[in-house]
Structures are given as C-alpha cells and as structure tokens.
Amino acid sequence: MISTNEFRTGLTVEVDGDPCQVIEFMHVKPGKGSPFVRAKLKNLRTGAIAERTFNAGEKLPRAILERKEMQYLYNDGANYYLMDNETYDQVGLSAGQLGDGVKYLKENMIINVVYHRGQVLGVDLPNTVELTVIETTPGIRGDTASGGSKPAVLETGVVLQVPLFVEEGDVIQVDTRSGAYIKRA
C-alpha cells in the first residue's frame, strides 16, 4: 500500500482494480477543511486519462507491473507476433496494444512487454532505433530556405523530417518517444 502523500510522477497504483500511472499530482491544503491530493491518472489498461481527488494520506495498493524481454518476429496483418526469449512462447498483440510503437518495429528487435496480472498492457520500446531510409528527395546544395529538412520514408513505412544531407540507403537513429531524427548511424 502506498499513501497519496508519497505520489510521484510515473508511479503506478491500482485504482478501482485497474493499474494507473500518475501523470501529474498536486497537494492542496485549503484554508478550511482537510488537505487532499488532486492527481491526473492514466489507466494503463484502457489508455484513458482521468483526474481524481484523494484525501491526504489515503492508502492505495501499488500496481505490480512485470516486464518481459521479447523478440519481435513478424506481422500477419491483424497481429504482431513476439517471442519470449526464455520459454520460446509466442504472443500475438494487436496494433492497439502496441500503440505508437508499431511504427518503429523491425524484425528481430528486442522490446519489453509490460504485464499486469498476466494481461498485456503495452510495450516499452528502446528510446532510439536505427532504421534505413528507403525513399527521400535529393538534397539540393544551398537550398536551406525551407528550414533545412525534407521528408523521408523509412523501412517500417514511417515518414519523418530529416536534414538535407540524408540520402536513400542511409541508416539513421530515430527517437521512438518523439518520432524525431537524431543522427546518422
């Protein structure tokens, strides 16, 4: 059990049986009445974000999340299949369960799958991935009036803005949290 006075951003607690992550919180001490904690929580099962108010010192159970390292195998159109490297069990996840991570998945990539009571909640991708540029317009020397970037299609199908010097066939690093170009690999 964890007290609402110990809330921190990123903490996972169980609210009404669902695992929730604290996004924001604020301790409020009104002039009259008892202090309370106003928190913005993200339900990890549904993805919904809700604001809740708790009495100061109220105890909530901590949500125990398991993380398993798995290898991405393939996509059959409906599901994305991952293999547990220890037991060799395969798990099929929908695009909804993977979230935005679908855009950066490459075959044989190692990712962490997050479980709560045996149910898959989502995945944690590495912060950066290396992807190959398969299509982009050639950069014209001296053409920086447009901000110095151009669109590029990567091997996974995602389109992002890259600097003018990046060419087809280049391997680049992409930040999976923001979807931004980092550097050439």
From Swiss-Prot:
It comes from the Bacteria. Keywords: Cytoplasm, Elongation factor, Protein biosynthesis. One of its GO terms (cellular component) is cytoplasm. The keyword Cytoplasm applies. It is found in: Cytoplasm. Pfam families: EFP, EFP_N, Elong-fact-P_C. InterPro entries: Elong-fact-P_C, NA-bd_OB-fold, Rib_uL2_dom2, Transl_elong_fac_P/YeiP, Transl_elong_KOW-like, Transl_elong_P/YeiP_cen, Transl_elong_P/YeiP_CS, Transl_elongation_fac_P. Involved in peptide bond synthesis. Stimulates efficient translation and peptide-bond synthesis on native or reconstituted 70S ribosomes in vitro. Probably functions indirectly by altering the affinity of the ribosome for aminoacyl-tRNA, thus increasing their reactivity as acceptors for peptidyl transferase. PANTHER family: ELONGATION FACTOR P, ELONGATION FACTOR P (EF-P) FAMILY PROTEIN. This is Elongation factor P.
